[in-house]
Amino acid sequence: SDFTSTSYAAHVFVIKQLYAFSSNDGFASNLGMQVFTAGGIQTGSSSYQYVHRSDTTNGVAATGQSTGASEIRINTPTQNGTNSHDNRYGAGYVWCYNLAPSKFSHFNIQYSYNKDQSVTGNYVSLTGMGLHEDATGVVGVRFKNDQGAVLRANIYLYGLEI
């Protein structure tokens, strides 16, 4: 089940798994979320793109990466005009549609380190995680990838059902 509920202090907390890399459909649209798979978002002078591991859109290849699971890549192709692995760093958002911010008191991102074999010694570090709501009311899970490499994660929202 996508939902797990448990009672606590007369409140019902709902855990919804928004995204799991074990899903083979790219970005788990069946779980009611959407992710930019090409084009990404613009932050300053850099464009952060979310692409499936097997997706070669915008020249992002899957070579040198582990297989068997989806991956979110954070690319900054405008850094030097290419999709260089060396420039894969920055902040990003995974957008979650149709979620009322008031219904979710907090969230949790579970992730594991995954060495990007195209960048020697480069591991993922997540900081600055938090919920983000844009001007149109779209709620996103914000993460920051300090060191580049490939991000693997299971994203959950824990919320107070009201």
PLM region descriptions:
Residues S1-I162:
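Surface-exposed molecular-recognition determinants
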